[in-house]
């Protein structure tokens, strides 16, 4: 057991695997029961194409859930990344049925049949510093604004669904021979690599395990990462050492907010921030004020408040 895990007893596990789960509807109930039995909070998405999600629990609980998943031969090599925190980052336990575990919205894209070349974190720096490589961040604009890799292109998308149109409008397989992509945990860039191959791009690479695995394995002094990394739970962001970062998140617009944002006259905790204060409807503002009062009351009673934040997984973002 590491000192970090002793000081921060909650394990946060981001996991996914593209694999054919033709029985995913029937798989939901036993999976949910396994989460409950192991005291796991968080959300897992399942579809015919696989499983995806982020969950949290005790060391024993996470180990128990992973052992249960790996007892299914289809999931024996399921990928997951771990970090730690000192309190539960999720309030509920859910398993959702989906058409896609990460929504690209393009028919025929199947990572179970075709994906790009996985690149280990230790080899990533050599790849992305190659001047012939086009480096693309597949995440949303609000994620990129907090941190990204040196020299990465920001597509400025607000949803992963917009990624295909961005590629079609800006890049040509005949011109852009080498493409490298990355995302938070590896799932979006893996699916994007399948799409890119289908569009005729020949050399397509993606970061295995995503940014989180890179931050875990690559020493900060050697890192090409700049800033913090957005995560889809109550921590909002993590630093290079995977400890909780300096950002909060606006409850109204979900934009990550910095200390400077919180000092703004347009920031009202739980209600608005400099990014949305002038665009909220009066109905939304009143609802946010009422919700914030409930949150503060729950805190005063030392009780968790289940609607304190409304987080989405990358597949739903």
From Swiss-Prot:
GO biological process assignments: tRNA modification
Encoding gene (name): trhO
Pfam families membership: Rhodanese (PF00581), UPF0176_N (PF17773)
Protein name, per record: tRNA uridine(34) hydroxylase
Active-site residues, Swiss-Prot/TrEMBL: 183
Cysteine pairs bridged by disulfides in the record: none
Reactions catalysed: uridine(34) in tRNA + AH2 + O2 = 5-hydroxyuridine(34) in tRNA + A + H2O
EC number annotated for this UniProt entry: 1.14.-.-
Annotated spans, Disordered: 298-317
Gene3D superfamilies: 3.30.70.100, Rhodanese-like domain (3.40.250.10)
Keyword annotations: Oxidoreductase, tRNA processing
PANTHER family: RHODANESE-LIKE DOMAIN-CONTAINING PROTEIN 7-RELATED (PTHR43268:SF3), THIOSULFATE SULFURTRANSFERASE/RHODANESE-LIKE DOMAIN-CONTAINING PROTEIN 2 (PTHR43268)
GO MF annotation list: oxidoreductase activity, acting on paired donors, with incorporation or reduction of molecular oxygen
Keyword Translocase appears in the UniProt entry: no
Domain spans labelled Rhodanese: 129-223
Oxidoreductase in keyword set: yes
Biological function: Catalyzes oxygen-dependent 5-hydroxyuridine (ho5U) modification at position 34 in tRNAs.
Highest taxon of source: Bacteria
UniProt record similarity statement: Belongs to the TrhO family.
Stored InterPro entries: Rhodanese-like_dom, Rhodanese-like_dom_sf, TrhO, TRHO_N
UniProt cross-references to CDD domains, sorted A to Z: RHOD_YceA
């Amino acid at each position: 057991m590491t000192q970090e895990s002793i000081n921060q007893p909650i394990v946060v596990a981001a996991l996914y695997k593209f694999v054919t789960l033709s029985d995913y509807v029937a798989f939901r109930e036993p999976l949910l029961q396994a989460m409950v039995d192991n005291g796991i909070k968080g959300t897992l998405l399942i579809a015919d194409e696989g499983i995806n999600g982020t969950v949290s629990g005790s060391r024993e609980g996470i180990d128990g859930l992973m052992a249960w998943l790996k007892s299914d031969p289809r999931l024996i090599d399921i990928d997951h990344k771990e970090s730690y925190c000192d309190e539960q980052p999720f309030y509920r336990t859910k398993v959702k049925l989906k058409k896609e575990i990460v929504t690209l919205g393009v028919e025929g894209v199947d990572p179970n049949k075709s994906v790009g070349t996985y690149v280990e974190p230790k080899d990533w720096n050599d790849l992305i510093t190659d001047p012939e490589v086009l480096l693309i961040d597949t995440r949303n604009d609000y994620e990129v604004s907090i941190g990204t890799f040196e020299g990465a292109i920001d597509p400025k998308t607000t949803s992963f669904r917009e990624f295909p149109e961005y590629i079609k409008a800006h890049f040509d397989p005949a011109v852009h021979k080498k493409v490298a992509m990355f995302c938070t945990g590896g799932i979006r860039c893996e699916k994007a690599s399948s799409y890119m191959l289908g569009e005729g791009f020949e050399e397509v690479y993606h970061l295995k395990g995503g940014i989180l695995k890179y931050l875990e394995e690559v020493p900060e002094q050697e890192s090409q990462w700049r800033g913090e990394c957005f995560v889809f739970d109550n921590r909002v962001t993590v630093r290079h050492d995977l400890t909780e970062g300096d950002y909060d998140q606006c409850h109204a617009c979900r934009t990550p907010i910095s200390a400077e944002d919180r000092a703004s006259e347009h920031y009202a905790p739980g209600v608005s921030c400099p990014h949305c204060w002038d665009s909220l409807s009066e109905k939304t503002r009143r609802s946010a004020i009422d919700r914030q009062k409930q949150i503060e009351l729950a805190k005063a009673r030392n009780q968790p408040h289940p609607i304190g934040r409304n987080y989405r997984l990358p597949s739903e973002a």
